[in-house]
């Protein structure tokens, strides 16, 4: 067995969404900040292609690179690589990273709770993990400040006509549509159509509405479309279905932590969710994330919330991705039969 490159990975998922973690074999990319390092990875694409493309990856996989933190108080830092984006933050990936750090013994576990400060490309996030018998059983992440951008905006989508949408930021950027109004009951068998239409809606929103982050001029696009289910009030708090279409055309298996944060920001802006209340989002496979509004703040001149999200993660395996020098596809390949719903 020979290899000119060996990347060491601990595989994990958070409530169904794959979020592998690179723990060795890759040196930190250049950059004075974690954000600058993530921009290098996005531009260079060598590592992204190696781990995300076939034959090592696929459209179903996200991969996180552990790097030394830049902030002196941070316990660890990570860069998120999604199928088409290298985003500021990800809820499911932060849960996967936290699970790997603790269950993998990289950060010492304290029972019944372990507290960590992680540095994501978009900023610092506080993590609290409920731990028992050597397992991080539930991860709580204080996400980046989240805000509603546009409410009840009109969006023309070819073949769908005029839609009423909200746009928001929850650590990543979303266009949000009413699932019921689009004819969806958020069942597993609707996944392909949700993915297909979601990408069309996202692309239309990028052309017609645009997105800008008041404090991050590099982030100027919508990444995802959230199909938002009806909010119900229960004894345990608010509850709603959620399905997020991810570029180039797949549905998140988890409820998507950044989407949950974005939706809470929209509900708060409408006066439909208060500080201290919780919203449980339910994915197409029935998994859940629970969000809570911890407080309020501003992002630039925009009112924002301080969201907390929580969910569970599990390690699924350990892998060594290798590259034989005779392999004619050192960065892999992708084909449209799987790379994008059509």
Curated annotation (Swiss-Prot):
Keywords: Isomerase, Lyase
GO molecular function, one term: 4-hydroxyproline epimerase activity
Residue positions of the active site: 90
Catalytic activity: trans-3-hydroxy-L-proline = 1-pyrroline-2-carboxylate + H2O; trans-4-hydroxy-L-proline = cis-4-hydroxy-D-proline
UniProt xrefs under InterPro entries: Pro_racemase_fam
Highest taxon of the lineage: Bacteria
EC number annotated for this UniProt entry: 4.2.1.77, 5.1.1.8
Induction: Is up-regulated when the bacterium is grown on t4LHyp or t3LHyp as sole carbon source.
This protein's record includes keyword Lyase: yes
One Pfam family here: Pro_racemase
Binding site for substrate: 91-92, 252, 257-258
Family affiliation: Belongs to the proline racemase family.
Function description: Catalyzes the dehydration of trans-3-hydroxy-L-proline (t3LHyp) to Delta(1)-pyrroline-2-carboxylate (Pyr2C). Can also catalyze the epimerization of trans-4-hydroxy-L-proline (t4LHyp) to cis-4-hydroxy-D-proline (c4DHyp), albeit with 30-fold lower efficiency. Is likely involved in both degradation pathways that convert t3LHyp to L-proline and t4LHyp to alpha-ketoglutarate, which would allow A.tumefaciens to grow on t3LHyp or t4LHyp as a sole carbon source. Displays no proline racemase activity.
Database matches in PANTHER family: BIFUNCTIONAL TRANS-3-HYDROXY-L-PROLINE DEHYDRATASE_2-EPIMERASE, TRANS-3-HYDROXY-L-PROLINE DEHYDRATASE
NCBIfam families the UniProt entry points to: T3LHypDht (NF047722)
Name of the molecule in the record: Trans-3-hydroxy-L-proline dehydratase
